[in-house]
A protein has these predicted regions:
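Fe(II)/2-oxoglutarate
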Residues: 1-13, 19, 23
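Non-heme Fe(II) oxygenase catalytic core, chiefly the N-lobe of the double-stranded beta-helix
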Residues: 3, 21-168
Length: 168
């Protein structure tokens, strides 16, 4: 199985990844300087820029200046998910997590106790806001664009969660 028992793959340091991340960070900084983008995507009392599909990558995952790193494209070619959509730029600011507009008390407590987590693709439906797998993701490629301290959680993946999602 491509993701093994863990459900994720950790890639080693690669200079192409650094170049791609540097380019993405520059583009991200331009996006974050745009008041219209902030108005659309800033959530949780100004502590989370959600930024779904805001990075201007092409359908192959690259930018005009730099292609998607080979180590990623070779791996992703095994899954055959092309064309790729625009990348999300998720930025956490000091004070996160704060309640998101419309969050119930239990939803906010979940975020507070679970590494500020949500499960991509699991969306609340109806008045009860029961969660269903509405937007299944073939893969999530998480690339940090800045240095974080050792206790930070730029991306959290629960070991074996891919098996749970397959059952749903």
């Amino acid at each position: 199985m491509l993701f093994g028992d863990k459900g994720y793959v950790k890639f080693n340091y690669d200079e192409q990844i650094v170049k791609w991340a540097d380019c993405a960070r520059e583009k991200g900084s331009e996006i974050l300087a745009n008041p219209g983008q902030l108005e659309e995507w800033l959530q949780c009392e100004g502590t989370w820029f959600v930024g779904v599909d805001v990075l201007p990558n092409d359908s192959s995952g690259g930018f005009d200046e730099v292609k998607l790193p080979c180590i990623f494209s070779k791996f992703l070619d095994k899954i055959n998910l092309k064309p790729y959509h625009k990348a999300q730029l998720s930025v956490i600011y000091p004070g996160y997590p704060r309640p998101r507009l419309g969050d119930s008390k239990s939803a906010f407590e979940y975020r507070l106790k679970r590494d500020a987590a949500h499960v991509d693709g699991l969306l609340p439906v109806g008045a009860q806001k029961r969660r269903y797998l509405i937007e299944p993701h073939g893969v999530i490629l998480g690339v940090p664009l800045n240095n974080t301290h050792p206790g930070a959680s730029p991306i959290v993946v629960w070991k074996g969660s891919h098996r749970i999602m397959q059952q749903e």
